[in-house]
């Protein structure tokens, strides 16, 4: 179902939802928790929407990655970071929803503790996204780059320099 789009592997297309939106949404949640003047209704809806779409995107990326794995294989490292990113996107959705609800209530220690958890999960989600992307890019491009024996250089005599 999620293996190809128009004959191309779907995974490289879907991961961009996660690579762009998950870190932005995580930063948005950190801003909501840490900067009270940023807590306007519009900001909350935008950030919350981004968090939910990120989690959905992480699921789609995970499933399309599993389909790609069947045909092309994948490194264990990329598989592990991809799974962590998916679970952290789900965790961020849950703790963000809880914190957003608690933000409508009077100040409490629960809200403070949940805010700290939101910040920590956000930082973990950003880190996991970067490491999943890095390991995926290495899996795709390291072998292709090493297969190329030709390294373009400019010879000073050929360029006319004396």
Place the predicted regions along the sequence by residue:
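Polytopic transmembrane helical bundles with strong interfacial aromatic enrichment
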Residues: 1-162
């Amino acid at each position: 179902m999620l293996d190809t789009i128009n004959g191309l592997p779907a995974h490289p297309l879907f991961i961009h939802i996660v690579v762009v939106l998950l870190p932005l949404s995580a930063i948005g949640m950190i801003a909501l928790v840490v900067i009270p003047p940023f807590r306007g209704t519009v900001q909350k809806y935008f950030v919350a929407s981004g968090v939910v779409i990120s989690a959905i995107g992480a699921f789609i990326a995970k499933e399309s990655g599993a389909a790609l794995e069947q045909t092309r294989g994948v490194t264990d490292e990329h598989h592990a970071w991809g799974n962590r990113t998916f679970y952290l996107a789900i965790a961020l959705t849950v703790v963000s929803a809880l914190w957003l609800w608690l933000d409508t209530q009077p100040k409490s220690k629960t809200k403070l503790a949940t805010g700290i958890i939101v910040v920590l999960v956000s930082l973990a989600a950003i880190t996991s996204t970067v490491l999943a992307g890095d390991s995926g890019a290495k899996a795709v491009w390291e072998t292709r780059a090493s297969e190329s024996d030709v390294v373009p250089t400019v010879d000073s005599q050929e360029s006319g320099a004396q």
